[in-house]
């Protein structure tokens, strides 16, 4: 299954643990969406990132091929947060070559507005740099840093 991952899901340590058989396919953007921190994480003690519709914006991430076993593991980790916190949704992403691909991703059921903390953003940055996302993506995530 083709899965679009973004944010903390891109961290290689986390990805190996949650989807050990994943295969990187390509970088992509989710058009007409942005990142919001609309769920609280007791593990991170801060807001968790989720994609949400937003005209004119885009979210950088990567497309991975994940196995059924990977998907079961990923869903188990998503269930570590309260039930129905995240759901799988089908979205169309754009590859760097401009090709539109239908994929699955996780989106949160929002409950409020929260702020990320530096340690969470550092974890995200490790993933962005590992997969060589463009500077635009890195700058966007830097802009979420607490002031």
Protein language model regions, located:
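Glycine-aromatic micro-motifs
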Residues: 1-147
